[in-house]
């Protein structure tokens, strides 16, 4: 769910995901789509593509379990869809951490009309 995703992103980046990423670029945040503006925005694009592959669970609402062990996210689900959901969220959290250096304040609060048509997953 969005709860676990928010926690993971904070644990990996140290940033408040609601204020730092919600309207970043063309792909970060619920319902946003467009050609990625930079590597940070691409993390969100790839995350959306990961969600599209899920069948049998709702990425926004379904809760899953994970742990934070030695500064690493460990997905602990037995349900296959929830395990994949956890792995999607883990991947975006790690991607955002690895790309903190590409974060461009000019892409915060990007309006949809400034986004080009998205590429395919």
Curated annotation (Swiss-Prot):
**In this UniProt entry, which cysteines form S-S bonds?**
26-115, 28-44, 43-95, 49-121, 50-88, 57-81, 75-86
Q: What is its main location?
A: secreted
Biological process (GO) annotations held by this record are: arachidonate secretion; lipid catabolic process; negative regulation of T cell proliferation; phospholipid metabolic process
Instruction: Tell me the organism's taxonomic lineage.
Output: Eukaryota, Metazoa, Chordata, Craniata, Vertebrata
Tissue specificity as recorded in UniProt: Expressed by the venom gland.
Recorded GO MF terms: calcium ion binding; calcium-dependent phospholipase A2 activity; phospholipid binding; toxin activity
Query: CDD domains per the record?
Result: PLA2c
Self-association or partners: how does it assemble? Homodimer.
Family (UniProt): Belongs to the phospholipase A2 family. Group II subfamily. R49 sub-subfamily.
Q: Where in the cell is it found?
A: Secreted
| Its job | Snake venom phospholipase A2 homolog that induces myonecrosis, and edema. Has low myotoxic activity.
Task: Return the PANTHER family for the record.
Answer: PHOSPHOLIPASE A2 FAMILY MEMBER (PTHR11716), PHOSPHOLIPASE A2, MEMBRANE ASSOCIATED (PTHR11716:SF9)
InterPro entries assigned to the protein according to its UniProt record, in alphabetical order: PLipase_A2, PLipase_A2_Asp_AS, PLipase_A2_dom, PLipase_A2_dom_sf, PLipase_A2_His_AS
Keyword annotations of the record? Disulfide bond, Myotoxin, Secreted, Toxin
Q: GO cellular component annotations, sorted alphabetically?
A: extracellular region
Identification of the protein by name: Basic phospholipase A2 homolog zhaoermiatoxin
């Amino acid at each position: 769910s969005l709860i676990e995703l928010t926690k993971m992103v904070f644990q990996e980046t140290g940033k408040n995901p609601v204020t730092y990423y919600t309207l970043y670029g063309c792909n970060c945040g619920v319902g946003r789509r467009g050609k990625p503006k930079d590597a940070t925005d691409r993390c969100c694009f790839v995350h959306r593509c990961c969600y599209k592959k899920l069948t049998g669970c709702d990425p926004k609402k379904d809760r899953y379990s994970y742990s934070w062990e030695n500064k690493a996210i460990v997905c602990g689900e037995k349900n296959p869809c929830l395990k994949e959901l956890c792995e999607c969220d883990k991947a975006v959290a790690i991607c955002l951490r690895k790309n903190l250096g590409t974060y461009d304040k000019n892409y915060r609060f990007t309006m949809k009309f400034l986004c080009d048509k998205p590429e395919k997953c």
